[in-house]
UniProtKB/Swiss-Prot annotation:
Quaternary structure and partners: Part of the 30S ribosomal subunit.
Gene name of the record: rps15
Family of this protein: Belongs to the universal ribosomal protein uS15 family.
Source organism (scientific name): Thermoplasma volcanium (strain ATCC 51530 / DSM 4299 / JCM 9571 / NBRC 15438 / GSS1)
Keywords: Ribonucleoprotein, Ribosomal protein
Protein name, per record: Small ribosomal subunit protein uS15
Length: 145
């Protein structure tokens, strides 16, 4: 399948083996959940928490152990981001590109990139409002510079 804003194809990669609980993990489920909650409370994003669990604690994937994704587990513990992580990273990217375009007004390729990022953000906001992740009154202009 082609990518969203280009005609190029994605690259193939290895697939994760699902349904096999890793037996080499040295931590119990409660310990893994407590570590994840502590890391999230320290200000890390969910993806960084997953990377930290993988690299430092030897937990290959939370879903294989719990049967649920990390965000769902953290939401059950009452720890939830008000803006989803993918939308938040797009907002940061948009702000950086917008600042660059202000300083370099003749950079037309980045103006187009800024417009593509905005289109992707609007699409995500529409999806999150429809699924109930974001409030219906939430507005994207509040978080943009």
């Amino acid at each position: 399948m082609a990518r969203m804003h280009t005609r190029k194809r994605g690259k193939s990669g290895s697939k994760k083996v699902y349904g096999v609980e890793p037996n080499w993990v040295q931590y119990s489920k409660d310990e893994i959940l407590n570590i994840a909650v502590d890391l999230k409370k320290s200000g890390m994003t969910s993806s960084v928490v997953g990377i930290r669990l993988r690299d430092q604690y030897g937990v290959p994937t939370v879903k294989a152990i719990f049967g649920k994704k990390l965000n769902k587990l953290l939401a059950e513990k009452g720890i939830r981001d008000e803006i989803p992580e993918d939308l938040n990273s797009l907002i940061k990217r948009y702000n950086n590109v917008a600042k660059h375009v202000e300083l370099n007004p003749k950079d037309h390729s980045n103006k187009r990139g800024r417009d593509l990022i905005m289109a992707k953000m609007l699409r995500l906001v529409r999806y999150y409002k429809r699924t109930g992740v974001l409030d219906q009154k939430w507005n994207l202009s509040k978080v943009l510079r």
